[in-house]
């Protein structure tokens, strides 16, 4: 118990130290009261970058592993500076991960909950009236996402996803095989072709860029059992409506465009008052925000009027349901026994649709925080297989699978063949 408590305190102190450095540039136990210094967000990666430059000056051919990055803005720092940078996430089933932390590191269930909250980008606050009390979520400050750990977001933007089964503590063969695969491709791009899982998920990744959602872009692909693509979708408004990214508070208050803004938005007194106040808040920022389109999320604004968290008010279709509807809309074939690929993971509503359609495999990147898996999918006698994505995606997909030169020409060149 003492070892577990010491480990927990150790992690908290290091997490607080990181938050302090990102907020004010140094370690201060009263950092939460300090004024946020935006340039401090990159203090840690700048320090790491200086170490990298020293190592490169000593040895020109240098391979660097940074263990580990848990802030998405630190990822952005290295991506903008190194073309050969790959963000690698190592994932394990949540059940196996928790079992490993409990058995090996002696975490209690409360400590696991604390860890998940602190690493998820959600602000937490410890109740000091109880010893080892779990952290409780509280309202985030405007700067909080810049200074805190957000493992969930880092997984979402990772370039390469590895799977590390934790059910056999000393068996690392699966992880070693994946490391050998991707390190070989980093050193020699194009040695082999992508897996079917990578190929389809890359399509979903590309599709998500069509989304006009202000909060998050998600892509989805439906295939048959052989990974032959039948439909793609992304989260966006229904065809014929204007996406949220192209609408604005200025527009809803002044244009009264019937195609762009709904009857409710043009006429509801309480909604328009809330929209007016938000617009004034933006305009009062002056030159700092000059030139921006003051887009707004209808769901967020409507919920702020109702003092509610209703998810039904979203304007957009989810990526998964959009893909399902494409098949129905254009007269596609049945997909029973097929696969659903999604760059996130299905919510409760989309999970029910996938189950009803007879989807056999759901391949996902980022686990959904709700109860879609435990309540909707893991029940009945036709449960789909849940598969966490393994492979390269996005920019790294092209970097490691595109040949620098045709392999035949490379062999001829190295072999001195004319």
Show the residue positions of the predicted features.
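Single conserved hydrophobic/aromatic residue that forms the stacking wall/gate
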Residues: 1-6, 10
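Glycine-rich phosphate-binding loop used to anchor ATP phosphates in small-molecule kinases
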Residues: 14-80
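Conserved phosphate-donor/acceptor-positioning beta-strand/loop module used by diverse small-molecule
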Residues: 67-69, 82-105
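Small-molecule kinase domains that catalyze NTP-dependent phosphoryl transfer to phosphate-bearing small molecules
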Residues: 103-175
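Short, compositionally biased leader-like segments
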Residues: 167-202
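Short, basic/aromatic recognition patches
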Residues: 192-218
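Short beta-strand scaffold segments in enzyme catalytic cores
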Residues: 218-232
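Zn2+-dependent cytidine deaminase-like catalytic core
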Residues: 231-408
């Amino acid at each position: 118990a003492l070892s577990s408590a010491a480990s927990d305190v150790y992690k908290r102190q290091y997490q607080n130290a990181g938050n302090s450095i990102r907020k004010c540039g140094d370690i201060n136990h009263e950092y939460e009261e300090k004024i946020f210094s935006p340039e401090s967000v990159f203090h840690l990666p700048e320090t790491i970058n200086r170490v990298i430059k020293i190592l490169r000056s000593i040895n020109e051919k240098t391979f660097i592993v940074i263990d580990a990055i848990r802030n998405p803005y630190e990822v952005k720092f290295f991506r903008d500076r190194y073309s050969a940078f790959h963000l690698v996430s190592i994932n394990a089933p949540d059940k196996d991960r928790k079992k490993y932390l409990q058995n090996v590191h002696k975490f209690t269930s409360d400590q696991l909950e604390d860890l998940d909250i602190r690493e998820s980008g959600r602000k937490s606050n410890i109740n000091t009236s109880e010893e080892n009390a779990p952290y409780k979520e509280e309202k985030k400050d405007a700067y909080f996402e810049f200074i805190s750990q957000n493992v969930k977001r880092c997984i979402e933007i990772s370039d390469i996803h590895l799977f590390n089964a934790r059910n056999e503590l000393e068996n690392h063969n699966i992880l070693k095989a994946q490391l050998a695969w991707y390190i070989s491709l980093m050193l020699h791009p194009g040695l082999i072709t992508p897996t079917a899982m990578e190929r389809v998920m890359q399509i979903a990744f590309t599709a998500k860029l069509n989304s006009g959602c202000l909060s998050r872009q998600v892509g989805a692909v439906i295939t048959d059992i052989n990974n032959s693509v039948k439909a793609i979708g992304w989260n966006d408004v229904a065809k014929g409506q204007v996406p949220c990214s192209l609408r604005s508070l200025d527009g809803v208050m002044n244009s009264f465009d019937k195609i762009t803004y709904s009857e409710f938005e043009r006429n509801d007194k309480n909604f328009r008052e809330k929209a007016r106040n938000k617009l004034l808040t933006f305009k009062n920022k002056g030159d700092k925000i000059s030139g921006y389109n003051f887009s707004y999320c209808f769901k967020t604004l409507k919920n702020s009027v109702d003092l509610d968290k209703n998810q039904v008010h979203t304007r957009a279709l989810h990526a998964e349901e959009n893909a399902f509807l494409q098949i129905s809309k254009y007269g596609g074939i049945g997909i029973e026994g097929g696969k659903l690929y999604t760059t996130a993971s299905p919510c409760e509503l989309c999970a029910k649709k996938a189950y009803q359609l007879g989807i056999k495999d759901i391949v996902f990147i980022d686990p959904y925080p709700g109860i879609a898996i435990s309540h909707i999918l893991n029940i009945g006698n036709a449960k789909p297989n849940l598969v966490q994505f393994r492979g390269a995606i996005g920019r790294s997909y092209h970097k490691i699978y595109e040949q620098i030169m045709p392999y035949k020409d490379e062999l001829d060149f190295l072999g001195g063949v004319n």
